[in-house]
Amino acid sequence: EAVNVAIEDRDIPDVLVVKGRDNLLRLIEAGMIEDLTETYEECTTDTIKEMYDSYGDSLLQSATVDGKLYAFPNTVIDDGAPLLWLRKDWIEKLGLKEPETVEEALEIVRAFVEQDAAGDGQTIGLACSTDVIAGADQTYGVDSAFIHAGAMPCHWILDESGDVVYGSVTQETKEALSKLRNLYEDGILDQRFLLRKTENIDNLLKTGHCGAIYGRWWAPNNPLSAAYSVDSNAEWKPYLLDKEQVNETQKISVFESYDQWMYVVVRKGYEHPEIVAKYVSAIFDQSRYANDASAREVNDYFSINVDPTARPLNINVDYEDALYRTTEHIQAALDKTLDVSELSGLEKSYYDTCKSFLNGQLTTANGWAAYASRIEAVGELQKAGIRSAQTLPLENVNAEIPQELQELENEAFLQIISGEKPVDYFDTFVVEWYANGGKELTEQVQNAYESGKD
């Protein structure tokens, strides 16, 4: 709506972050933003260009019309698979062994509940959001349960026949829901998850009543750092289990739609269009990767978990495998197999924070979070060698799932998990999903995929 008004009034800021490729195209068609092709070639560092190249051609192509680049796209690095975070101190307290399989881990969660690890009769099981699927930027989803079943819900994917299908309507998703239902019936999944809001689960972590969550590598930053601030003896440890199945699921071809992507554009006629190229190069190359004392303050902010949205432009530009590169270098420096002088500015900041934490000089939650996320969690992902398949671009189609179908899906998932509906109700849900617009939407996405191959 804001873009509509801006186009109608022909009034936009000199530099603007635009959400969605559709809005970007409208600004281009209205002739309101600068062609940044020359700016990109002449004012962007080689390192930034390498970063964009690491995603293949599709990312920059999404900001290109008639051979002209009109925006600097945001990049989304490979975040790896979700991990299971368990209270290791509880495992030791109950005299249990650390898990090597998903089944062993779930039995540990059962023991947390049945033996009341919290000690006051209020221990809950595995936390679960009513959104069920957290994706790469939310908390408390049970995404791993789907990954372990070979499912990719909430994504457009290619099936084994090479056809487009919405991942939430596959038999693998049904299998995952069946397993979650069993966990709920067995008391392993939080029995009151339907009533929980995010802040309620946050509080259960802080008060020491929850000892199991699924989360990405950054879970120590959010939500676990808040719990650590209250009780530094709560030892949360990440586990990546059933690695072979996780690796197979991560290889599924997933489509990437640019409907929700962020793009930085420059107003047509602005005297200094090069400012975006210089900003991106300064923040994401020279500050992050050069070991430059002048950039130390910026990098120190990141290493102690300062919200990156405090940047002037809320985007990120980095290598697709930046997460693994950074941790590999920090770990090597900690092991003394890499000289600290060879670390980038950002890596040096994390190295200093992690070293201070290990030496006992930095005992804050931010110090723990830096080490637990960058070294322990990413280290688990690195050891497994699991990488996500490169996404397939999805252009010239609105692939977003309508609100009606989103609600139908979420309600069906919750009803099946909680036992309100039988597992076979999933088949009814699939029929309804296709009948209420899913069939036409799937055909549109299939056609867009086919035309994009030509």
Model-predicted segments: where are they?
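Helix-loop-helix "hinge/cap" segment bordering the ligand-binding cleft or interdomain interface
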Residues: 37-42, 64-138, 158-216, 263-299, ...
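Extracytoplasmic "Venus flytrap"/periplasmic binding protein-like
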Residues: 2-58, 64, 89-100, 114-118, ...
